[in-house]
Amino acid sequence: MSNMNWHIKGLLFENCSCQLICPAHISFKNVCNHDRCRGHWAFHIDEGCVADVILDSLNIVVVFDSPVQMHSGNWTQVFFIDERATEPQRDALEMIFSGKAGGPWEILAKFVSNQLTTRVVPMQFEDTGKTKRLLIPDMFETTVSAIRGSDGDKHAVLSNLHNVIHGPEHVLAHGKTRCTDSDFNFVLQKTHGLYSNFSWTG
């Protein structure tokens, strides 16, 4: 599958333990706010495929724990994959997000030293415009809510940053997350959050 063409696009939203804005979002060489950076990237796929395997409407969450300087590597990471995904769809998602299919995750995979066994779980995804939410019952819940800009109408945004997974415009947000997975147990409240529309190919 790694030699097959693929594309994927949709919504990406994140929350981590840093205060807004996470220093590592500007550069992995920056030092994060605490002794470790813990958080997630959550994805709702609008459209995507790996060869003839369609990925439309599926969700995946990447939960991570990294040292204070993310560029130093030694991340621990796990995938939560939507239980609606068939086995070929799960294989395709793992291929993309592990970096084995090329694309942006091939870069991020170099920082991961401990990839844990994927969890296949029920997911509930909600998008109400300025607020994005994903729930895995009894295990994981995250919400990010956009920060209003100075004009009182549009959201505050970041743009023209070098970032391999986000789209060109990142909406600033406050996030909250509760994770009670057996290997990740943390609670975040009003910390760094972002969301954007992503598009990748490989």
Regions flagged by a language model, labelled:
Residues 2-48:
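N-terminal ordered "arm"
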Residues 7, 32-39, 53, 71-80, ...:
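Short, well-ordered strand-loop elements centered on a beta-strand within folded domains, enriched
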Residues 12-17, 32-33, 49-54, 105-107, ...:
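N-terminal start-of-chain detector that recognizes signal peptides
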Residues 37-61, 175-177:
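Short, positively charged
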Residues 57-202:
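Internal, well-folded beta-alpha domain core
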